[in-house]
Amino acid sequence: MRSVWHRDSLLPEHPALTGEVRTDVLVIGGGLAGLLTARELQQRGVDVVLVEKDRICSATTAHTTAKITAQHGLIYQKLIRSIGTEGATQYYRANAEAAERLKELCRRFGVPMEEKNNFVYSSSRQKLGDELSALHKLGIPAIFEESPPLPISTAGAVGIPGQTQFHPLKLAKHLAKELTIYENSGVMELIGIYYHNRAIKPYADLRRAHKN
């Protein structure tokens, strides 16, 4: 099924890899995570090549809900139990900072985005209550929705206001312009650890560059 994001955004095609290519870092996978990783490295002066077995952003990214949020399920009650209040706070801050950096990229490239409240629903009122308490304990603004407008029965939903939804393929299109990308280039084998690393695909060979 063609995703909603493809209706108004077509990504450019990239050649398949043939022959031998040398690079400092090879990024395997051309979703948003791979594109952002490659860009971060390139911005720091690293020679990067990205390979994708199909087309970039054709799998998970193409069908994502495109949320930029620090709320990833009912996790903060679990984090407090496992790594403590300080660790849970650091987790939130790291994700909030990453969200701001991603929104800054969207603003820089003129990618459409919209501020929205993010919600996580559950059939357990106890779990929702525990999560709401955990968020408040960490000083995270949180809200409770008694009857979320969903086509299924729930016990409510816990939300964090001021999160964001964006157009993932329009961001990917801008990121891809700056990168060396090979599509239809699935990696079949990795050879070597630490030194003389190689990634092998049919009819091609990627090797770690050696610079003096």
Segments predicted by a language model, with ranges:
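Extreme N-terminal leader/targeting segments of oxidoreductases
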Residues: 1-25
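N-terminal Rossmann-like FAD-binding beta1-loop-alpha1 element of flavoenzymes
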Residues: 20-50
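Glycine-rich FAD pyrophosphate-binding loop
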Residues: 43-63
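Residue-level detector of anion-binding/catalytic polar loops
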Residues: 47, 112, 141, 180-181
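Short, hinge-like loop/turn segments at secondary-structure boundaries
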Residues: 66-70, 161
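Dinucleotide-binding Rossmann-like beta1-alpha1 core, especially the glycine-rich loop
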Residues: 71-147
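Helix-loop-beta segment of a Rossmann-like dinucleotide-binding subdomain
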Residues: 110-120, 145-174
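Helical element adjacent to the flavin cofactor pocket in flavoenzyme catalytic cores
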Residues: 129-138, 157-211
